Amino acid sequence: MRHILAENFYAASRRYNRAAMNTATSQSPAIASHWPLQALNTFGIAATARAYLRVSSSADLQAVRTDTALSTLPRLVLGGGSNLILSGDFDGLVLHLANQGKRIVSEDDTHIIVSAQAGENWHEFVQWTLEQNLPGLENLSLIPGSVGAAPIQNIGAYGSELKDFFHSLTYFDFSTGEICVLDREACRFAYRDSIFKQDLRDRAVILEVSFALPKHWQPNLSYTELEHELTTSGVVAPTARDISEAVIAIRRRKLPDPSVIGNAGSFFKNPIVSKEVHAVLLEKYPLLVSYVQPDGSVKLAAGWMIDQCGWKGKSLGAAGVHEKQALVIINRGGASGADVLKLAQAIQEDVRQRFDVTLEIEPVLV
């Protein structure tokens, strides 16, 4: 196994275990036809996949790659289905990651390396690290989805991002049939972005993700709402568990439970603008909610702008905007992908007209 450095990504991309890949069965994997997807996406959109495979190992992926009929089908890699909007039936192969397992890998003087298989539930993995007395990921509690999907988005919340604790990952490359390893730099993490949404899109399937958790932990209370939640709860010197519980309380209070109300979490990215653009907006809208970034740019609160346009609690057909969080689009019952996109586009247009800012949709549209 070798790490792939960002500066020589393509040159260094190598298999680390050809012998393991050669053990993949030559038989075709057990494929299900016309598989219902409504229960596999948190928005609850009714759709069907032409073909479906529950993936438990890289051997399953290798079998798909070497199967003449399956290898030509469009592919959709599915984890928890929490960042996905289906526009209709999927005329291809859904690869549903189900590989499980988490472990403590190693440690040195400053960090403990932990690893989880891609099919693990993200929130359950975070809680497992806390049960092992390994702090670091607590600010990312209760984010829906799987471990394998987390690096793709570089998930983040309450002042923390996945990249802050990321160590490395392994992925299956459908182009070469090899299993490769990427370090943090090679993943090209950015705000809700990574190489998996760029150069490796439709090519890589993440298998396992490792994190470097600090031995000398310091609480991250940079998010004002989180600090206020702890203060009002009477917590003076918060532990990682205290922070996790505070984050969970905030999220449950503000965000709808997808098991009750279909949704895909934050539907729009918070736009990032230059300080000059921010200054112009602030002069016109003194109450504009914004956050200065380390590089001097400014992140604008998309939810605030949507709220100012009057969309909070409103609906367009079977899709609506949540009454407590304008950044969240919800399924009011029987919403189709077309319903969701129609509402999203109407919101984008109103925000563009009022603020001259373009909102980017966060979930993957299929």
What is each residue range found by the language model?
Residues F9-Y10, Y16:
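Aromatic (phenylalanine/tyrosine) cluster motif
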Residues N22-S175:
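Anion-binding (especially nucleotide phosphate/pyrophosphate-binding) glycine-rich loop
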Residues I31-S33, Q38-I45, L84, I179-A338, ...:
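Phosphate/pyrophosphate- and phosphate-bearing ligand-binding catalytic cores of soluble enzymes
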